[in-house]
């Protein structure tokens, strides 16, 4: 442990059960969490007050994502329900729309949701397909994944392409024309997580076999990064996409993604956590970040070039989610634990 001081939280609440998802509104005012029993908690960080809690679904919840521009968020459940909610100016939350998808008997759960960058469509992974819906809940397109269950989806930064991944590789569809044939990036194993670089030059995947696989999008040239002790689900870009942070070990692994790319180059590592890293989040300016591990330790780093974190804290159990406020210049960090603790931290002046 270095000489960094522990950062205190300025807000704390019990979610009542393990968290299923955590996310900030685009304006940075509200942070919302939903637990596995579908109880929703919305905190107004401007006043420090929590809005009235409610049950979003009759069954278990799996995901929650805010719209990239509006005070609107979406929740999903095990039975294929998708509900859209809006926070009004009077701090009352009401339901905008509700749909239920039954695409695949026995696997209708929806745990992956992702808004198109411009907010015009929501991508929903269900069974062996990805469905695009409007903000109003109207289904506008559907893309199939031949490899079976969709494990991950990711939008190209410009928003015209949608990557769908699972067993056998990645299928990249043109969201503007559902009739176009997909671009297929084949891989022999199962993909669990997916991310585009901020410039769209690379698409990277965390794999079942404890590796990270990458493709250069233009040339389709691929490469593999190995040496992970666990599944590297965390794929987080810093320094305007010049570096990629990955989990999969107790050390933070930093891969170079400059013009030369990572092929044939050794990554840098940062030793701080004693247990496997299970959450990584980057600030809105893309420079500072936080990492969390299985024993509840959170480290806050000012730069990927620093060898030690600037501050740290410890939750009561495994770190489940970490998210920074997307508001410009904001340094508010939200964190949840396996036991259902939600805490907010202000790292202003630290990072």
Locate predicted features.
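WD40-repeat beta-propeller superdomains and closely related acidic/aromatic-rich repeat-like regions
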Residues: 1-351
């Amino acid at each position: 442990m270095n000489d960094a001081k522990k950062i205190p939280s300025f807000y704390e609440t019990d979610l009542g059960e393990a968290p299923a998802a955590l996310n900030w509104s685009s304006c940075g005012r509200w942070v919302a969490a939903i637990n596995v029993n579908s109880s929703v908690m919305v905190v107004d960080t401007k006043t420090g007050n929590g809005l009235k809690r409610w049950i979003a679904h009759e069954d278990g919840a799996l995901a929650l994502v805010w719209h990239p521009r509006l005070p609107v968020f979406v929740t999903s459940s095990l039975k294929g329900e998708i509900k859209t909610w809006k926070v009004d100016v009077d701090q009352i939350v009401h339901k905008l729309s509700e749909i239920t998808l039954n695409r695949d008997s026995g696997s209708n759960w929806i745990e992956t949701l992702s808004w198109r960058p411009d907010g015009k469509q929501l991508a929903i992974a269900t069974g062996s397909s990805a469905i695009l819906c409007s903000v109003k809940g109207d289904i506008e397109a559907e893309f199939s994944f031949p490899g079976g269950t969709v494990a991950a989806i990711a939008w190209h930064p410009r928003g015209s392409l949608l990557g769908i991944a699972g067993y056998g590789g990645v299928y990249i569809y043109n969201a503007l024309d559902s009739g176009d044939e997909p671009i297929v990036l084949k891989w022999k194993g199962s993909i669990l997580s997916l991310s585009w670089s901020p410039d769209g030059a690379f698409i990277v995947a965390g794999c079942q076999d404890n590796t990270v696989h990458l493709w250069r999008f233009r040339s389709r040239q691929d490469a593999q990064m190995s040496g992970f002790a666990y599944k590297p689900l965390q794929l987080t870009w810093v320094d305007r996409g010049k570096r990629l942070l990955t989990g999969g070990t107790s050390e933070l692994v930093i891969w170079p993604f400059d013009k030369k790319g990572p092929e044939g180059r050794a990554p840098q590592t940062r030793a701080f956590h004693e247990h496997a890293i299970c959450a990584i989040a980057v600030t809105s300016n893309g420079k500072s970040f936080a990492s969390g591990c299985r024993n509840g330790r959170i480290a806050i780093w000012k730069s990927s070039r620093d060898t030690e974190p600037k501050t740290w804290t410890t939750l009561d159990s495994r770190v489940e989610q970490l998210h920074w406020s997307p508001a410009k210049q904001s340094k508010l960090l939200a964190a949840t634990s396996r036991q259902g603790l939600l805490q907010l931290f202000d790292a202003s002046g630290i990072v």
